[in-house]
Amino acid sequence: MNATAEILMVEDNEDDIAVALWAFSKHNLQGRVEVVRDGQQALDRVLAQPLGQIKVILLDLRMPRVDGREVLRRLRADERTRTVPVVVVSSSSHADDIAACYRLGANSYVCKRYSTARAGEYLIDVVHYWVDLNRIPESPGQDQK
């Protein structure tokens, strides 16, 4: 467990994880990322974190134990995690999958890109926006900046 992780990547495909970690390392973000490999681990991890520490969740849809849609539904149903940004990162470009994720409260939906020229780099753009530019509500009791 990375106690300082701001980015939680929920992905079960080892190749996708390797590409993402390579891109994060290339941009000196590896210390800010934690990877979990199924939906139940994601829920356990998010609920164990102090509120506001995780700045974005990168969530795959098709995973063992608890799938991405159910993770999203549970995160949005819980007052503690309702405002944590969730970006669905999926190989599916089906309109039904995209619409379902937005209905469940996804903040964004990104289709995985497999081009070797920019493999993993699209995640850097996503993370830059959600971690460095976007602001989420502060947790109760935290000082406002």
Residue ranges and their predicted role:
Residues Y114-V126, R135-P140:
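C-terminal output helix
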Residues N107:
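Short, glycine/charged-rich "phosphate-handling" switch motifs in NTP-dependent
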Residues A3-T4, L29-Q30, G52-V56, R80-P85:
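His-Asp phosphorelay/catalytic-motif detector in bacterial-type signaling
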Residues M63-V66:
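Receiver (REC) domain active-site loop signature in two-component systems and cognate sites
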Residues L59-D60, S90:
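Active-site residues of response regulator receiver
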Residues T4-S25, I57:
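Conserved acidic segment of CheY-like receiver
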Residues L21, V35-V56, G120:
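Acidic, metal-coordinating helix/loop segments flanking the phosphotransfer/catalytic sites
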